[in-house]
Amino acid sequence: MSKLSFRARALDASKPLPVFRCEDLPDLHEYASINRAVPQMPTGMEKEEESEHHLQRAISAQQVYGEKRDNMVIPVPEAESNIAYYESIYPGEFKMPKQLIHIQPFSLDAEQPDYDLDSEDEVFVNKLKKKMDICPLQFEEMIDRLEKGSGQQPVSLQEAKLLLKEDDELIREVYEYWIKKRKNCRGPSLIPSVKQEKRDGSSTNDPYVAFRRRTEKMQTRKNRKNDEASYEKMLKLRRDLSRAVTILEMIKRREKSKRELLHLTLEIMEKRYNLGDYNGEIMSEVMAQRQPMKPTYAIPIIPITNSSQFKHQEAMDVKEFKVNKQDKADLIRPKRKYEKKPKVLPSSAAATPQQTSPAALPVFNAKDLNQYDFPSSDEEPLSQVLSGSSEAEEDNDPDGPFAFRRKAGCQYYAPHLDQTGNWPWTSPKDGGLGDVRYRYCLTTLTVPQRCIGFARRRVGRGGRVLLDRAHSDYDSVFHHLDLEMLSSPQHSPVNQFANTSETNTSDKSFSKDLSQILVNIKSCRWRHFRPRTPSLHDSDNDELSCRKLYRSINRTGTAQPGTQTCSTSTQSKSSSGSAHFAFTAEQYQQHQQQLALMQKQQLAQIQQQQANSNSSTNTSQNLASNQQKSGFRLNIQGLERTLQGFVSKTLDSASAQFAASALVTSEQLMGFKMKDDVVLGIGVNGVLPASGVYKGLHLSSTTPTALVHTSPSTAGSALLQPSNITQTSSSHSALSHQVTAANSATTQVLIGNNIRLTVPSSVATVNSIAPINARHIPRTLSAVPSSALKLAAAANCQVSKVPSSSSVDSVPRENHESEKPALNNIADNTVAMEVT
C-alpha cells in the first residue's frame, strides 16, 4: 500500500492474497488521500451526454466516500403518481391464490408474437368478440404475421388469406383494421424495433447499438457425431409434435363445422315446421331449383359395407366424404405388413342391396391435402377391408404374383351365378348375341378317331388351325359316340345305336340320350364337323377331275311349278367309291384347252347368227337354234364325264365370286376373235373364262307388255335340280304350252363350266325371265356380296338376240349400264345358277 500509483492488473488465482489484521488497516479518511494514478478511460459518450444531470450526480456520488450515506444519490427517473388510473387497472381487493403460477422446467416455450396489444386494439377486440370467436393473443398473432409478411408495401387481402389460417370473415375484419391503423402510423411498422448492428460493419463505433454480434472465432475442433444425431432427433421430435398440433387443429375445425351444420339443420327444421312442410314437398322443390354444386374432390367414391366387399348401384347416393388413411400411409411408410383380407361372403348375400352403415361410408383419396395425414375416429374398421393380402396368402395362392387383387379406387360388382352366358355364341334368349361366326359344332378327330364334343375352328399363328373346345352337359355322351355310325347313312339310327349302347353301358337313360343325339346329328339339327383329306382317282385317264369349292351339306329341292329350271348335266357313278376329286397338271391343261375351244366355237356361232339375221325371220330363228343346240351339245359331251358323282349346290358367296371371275364380256370375246392363234391360259383374275352368255345380245318378243308380267305362283324360291343335258325336252316341258308355232325356236347357251340355260324366244320366254331372277333361295342370296352378283349380272346374264316381227330393245331391266348406280342390290337380269 506504500505505492501511491499502480496500474490495473488482471486477477491471478494462483497468486496468494495478503492477509491484514484489523489494526494494520488504515482509517477510512486515509483512503481518500491516496491518489490512485489510474489513466482516465473514455466513456464513449458525447459531450452533451457526459454533462447530463443524472450522470454527473452518479459520478460525483461514486467519488464521494467521506460523506454520509444519506447524501449518496442513486439516479432514478422522476415518477408521477396517478391513483385514479392505478385503481382502475388493479382492483382494490386482492386475494392470495391457492396455487402460484407453475412453469414446467423442460417445457417448450411457445413463440410469442412481437406485436403488443395497445388500448385501441383492446377496444377493437372487445367489440369483435361479440360477433366472432377471437382472443387478444390470436389478434396479436394475426397482426404480427401481417406486419412481418409485408415490407414497405402492405400485403393484399388475397395474400392475407394465405398468411392467416382463419375464417374469411375474421380475416377481412382484422385486415381492414390493420390497414387503417398502418396508414395512421408514421413509422414504417407497428412493431417497435431495437437498433441493432448492421451487417456491413458501418455501425461498429455507434454507441446507440443495443446488441452487437459476437466476434467470430476460429473453430478449432470438429463437431461430434452425437451432436448430429441429437439434431436429427430434435428435428424428428419437432415434426411429430407439429403433426400432433395439425391433427388437433383439424379436429377443431371439424367439430366447428359440425356445430355449424347442427345449427343450420335446426334452423331448416324450424322453417319447415312454421311452413307446415311435413311431407317434404316444399323441401324437394327448393332442392330441385338449387344449382348442383361440384364436389370438393373429384375422386370416385368407393362404397364399402361391413358385410361384403362388393356394392351395387342402389346404395351409391352418399354425399359425405372421408379421408383414405391407406393411401397416405403408403406414401409415408413404403414398407408395411399387410393385414389379412376378411373372407368374402357368398354372392347371394353380396347381391342383395344393403343400406350403408355410418361406419361404412365411402372414402376418398386425400393426397391433395398439404397437411399431414389425419385419420378419423370412425375409420378404423375400414382398415382391414382396404388392406392388401398378406405374404402367406400370396404363397398359398395358385396364381402366385399374378393373383387378382382389388385396387383402391375401382368399383367391383358381384358375379351373377344364375346367368351363365353373355357369350357371343349363345342364343339371344340366354343373353348372348347368337352370332353364326362364333358357333360351336360337334367335332370328330381322325387321328386318333374320337369325338371331342363341341368345338370351333380358328386360324392361329403360321396358318395353323386351332380348335376351341366348349363344355356342355353332354360331354360324357359325346365321348362314347360311334364314329362309324356318324358317317353311316340315316337308316334306323336308333336300332343301330341300341346294339352299341348295350356294349358300352346298361343305363337306359344314357342309351336314350345318345340315340336322340344321333338322330339330331344325322337329321342335320346339330352341325357336325369332321376333317377330311381329298383322294385321287387315276382309273380313267380320259376323265377330267374337278375341284369342289366348298365341302358342305348337299342340299336338294324341287322347283315350283311355273318357273323355268336351269339345270346342270351330271352323271352318277355306278361305283360306291368316294366322290372326291383333285386336279393334276395334265388334266388342268386339257381342261383349259377345251374351254378355249368352246369360246372359239361360240364366237363363230354368234357371227353366223348376226349374218343370218338379215334374212327371213323364221329361217334365221330355226337355223340359229339348231346351230346352238348342236354346237353346245357337241362341246358339253366331253365335260359330262368329269362331273360324275357331284351334287348341285345353290350359289354361295365364294362360288358367286368364282363364277363372276370365270365369265367374260363381249368385248373380250371380240378381242379373242381378232387374234389368229388362240392363246391358252388367258382369263379374268387368274381363272380361264368359261363358256357363257355374251353381253350385247337381246331378246325379242311379240308383246311388249309381257315384259313386266310376273306370275304370283313363281314368287316362291326353289332349288335347282341336276339332270342330264340330253334331256332338254323334259326340262322345258313346263313352258311348252306357252310357245306358239311361229315362235317355237329356242336359244341354248352355256353359263360357266357346266350350266346350260335354255331360253325360248317367245312371249312365254319373256314371262319366265323374271321368275328365274327371283328363284334363288333368300337365305343363299343374303350371304352373297352384292358386288359379286352385280358383276356376274352385268357381264354374263343376257341372252342372244333373235329378230321377230315386233322387236323390243332389251329384257326388263333398269338400264344399269348408263346410270352405274351403287351395287347395293341384285339386278333384275340376274339368272340363278348352280355351281358344282
Curated annotation (Swiss-Prot):
Key words of the record: Activator, Chromatin regulator, Cytoplasm, Differentiation, Growth regulation, Isopeptide bond, Nucleus, Phosphoprotein, Spermatogenesis, Transcription, Transcription regulation, Ubl conjugation
Molecular-function GO terms, alphabetical: chromatin-protein adaptor activity; enzyme-substrate adaptor activity
Coiled coil: none
Protein name, entry field: Enhancer of polycomb homolog 1
Biased amino acid composition, Low complexity: 346-360
Biased composition annotated in UniProt, kind: Basic and acidic residues: 811-820
Positions of crosslink type Glycyl lysine isopeptide (Lys-Gly) (interchain with G-Cter in SUMO2): K319, K673
Gene Ontology terms: cellular component: cytoplasm; NuA4 histone acetyltransferase complex; nuclear body; nuclear membrane; nucleolus; nucleoplasm; nucleosome; nucleus
Membership in a protein family: Belongs to the enhancer of polycomb family.
GO annotation terms (biological process): DNA-templated transcription; double-strand break repair via homologous recombination; negative regulation of DNA-templated transcription; negative regulation of gene expression, epigenetic; negative regulation of transcription by RNA polymerase II; positive regulation of DNA-templated transcription; positive regulation of double-strand break repair via homologous recombination; positive regulation of transcription by RNA polymerase II
Organism expressing this protein natively: Homo sapiens (Human)
Region described as Disordered: spans on this chain: 335-360, 372-401, 802-829
